[in-house]
């Protein structure tokens, strides 16, 4: 593995579906290129993420079990994708054994994948409760219920959602593209579809790119079971510099599309993400909610549209 290349660690806790198969789905090909390693059990699949905002060279690192995770791999993990068998009542037990490592890595993207949830094994409620507790997003490869065709904001599902989440992550070696004047859309992509800035919505059903107002509303959707948090607690948790950070972020997002502006926007997002990563898990969610609300106000959003939103609301 090339030094300094970030990775999305992919593993499977099911004997019927391997991590390599999941990588095939993500890359959309069965003809995979694998980097040679000293340990044949661990495989690195190079992947260049290339979208309209940035490009980044990463590895999809397939690790069959947690005992094969080396210090080098641990240092490079920036996303964690784990597959489990939803038809087995004990399907989440093996996944839970990875939690100490995931908590040490604190990756911004953590996805729990299954073919589909099952009433005879792990049902949707149990899977989502587990996700909420541990900061994951649930993705079904073959969901029983698909989004309505006439939905104004159809949800991404299956492998498409996994690819979308990995594209939305701010990878450490990201290279900005300088020919785009879409700062606000960039922020939507980076903070509205995944767990950037502190896992604000750990187990929402697969979520599309939303306008700012809808995105802010969605922070409180599908969050049953989150702990009660008062405004005073929020204010005591966040960094005193947060308000200044928000104002700068808003200015960069609504400003011009020159290269320097984009680079500063990415730098500020990375800086805020790193700050949030130092907080305990529950505080990270509260921090992310405050960031979303404050940002909405900073760009001129209507307070009425987000009034009353908090992490203890249930829908």
Curated annotation (Swiss-Prot):
Q: Which residues form a coiled coil?
A: none
Q: Does the keyword Magnesium apply?
A: no
Its GO biological process terms?
A: protein transport
Localization in the cell = Cytoplasm, Cytosol
Q: Where is the composition biased (Basic and acidic residues)?
A: 203-224
Q: What is its main location?
A: cytoplasm
Q: Which UniProt keywords apply?
A: Cytoplasm, Phosphoprotein, Protein transport, Transport
Q: Single GO cellular component annotation?
A: cytosol
Asked if the record carries the keyword Lipoprotein, the reply is no
Q: What segment(s) does the record annotate as region Disordered? A: 197-233
Q: Which residues carry this modification: Phosphoserine?
A: 310-311
Record-linked Pfam families: Adaptin_binding
Return the InterPro entries for the record.
Alpha/Gamma-adaptin-bd_p34
* PANTHER family documented for this protein: ALPHA- AND GAMMA-ADAPTIN-BINDING PROTEIN P34
What is the stated purpose of this protein? May be involved in endocytic recycling of growth factor receptors such as EGFR.
Oligomer status and interactors: Associated with AP-1 and AP-2 complexes.
What's the name of the protein?
Alpha- and gamma-adaptin-binding protein p34
Q: Which organism is it from?
A: Pongo abelii
The taxonomic lineage of its organism, from the top, reads: Eukaryota, Metazoa, Chordata, Craniata, Vertebrata
């Amino acid at each position: 593995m090339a030094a300094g290349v970030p990775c999305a660690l992919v593993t499977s806790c099911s004997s019927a579906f391997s991590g390599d198969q999941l990588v095939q789905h993500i890359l959309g090909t069965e003809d995979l290129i694998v980097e040679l390693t000293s340990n044949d059990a661990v495989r690195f699949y190079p992947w260049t993420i290339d979208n309209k905002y940035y490009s980044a060279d990463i590895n999809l690192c397939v690790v069959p079990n947690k005992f094969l995770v080396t210090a080098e791999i641990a240092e490079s993990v920036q996303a964690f994708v784990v597959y489990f068998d939803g038809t087995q009542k004990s399907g989440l037990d093996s996944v839970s054994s990875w939690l100490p490592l995931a908590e040490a890595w604190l990756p911004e993207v953590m996805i729990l994948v299954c073919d589909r949830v099952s009433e005879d094994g792990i049902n949707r409620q149990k899977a989502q409760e587990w996700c909420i507790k541990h900061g994951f997003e649930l993705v079904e490869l073959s969901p029983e219920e698909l989004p309505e065709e006439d939905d104004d904001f159809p949800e991404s599902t299956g492998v498409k959602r996994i690819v979308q989440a990995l594209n939305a992550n701010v990878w450490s070696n990201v290279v900005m593209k300088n020919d785009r004047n879409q700062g606000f859309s960039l922020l939507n992509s980076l903070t509205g579809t995944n767990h950037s800035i502190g896992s604000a919505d750990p187990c929402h059903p697969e979520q599309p790119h939303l306008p700012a107002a809808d995105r802010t509303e969605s922070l409180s959707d599908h969050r049953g079971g989150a702990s009660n948090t008062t405004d005073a607690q929020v204010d005591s948790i966040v960094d005193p510099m947060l308000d200044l950070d928000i104002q700068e972020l808003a200015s960069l997002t609504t400003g011009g599309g020159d290269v320097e502006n984009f680079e500063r926007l990415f730098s500020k997002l990375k800086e805020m993400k790193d700050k949030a990563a130092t907080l305990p898990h529950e505080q990270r969610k509260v921090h992310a909610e405050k960031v979303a609300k404050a940002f909405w106000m900073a760009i001129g959003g209507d307070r009425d549209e987000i009034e009353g939103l908090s992490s203890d609301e249930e829908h």
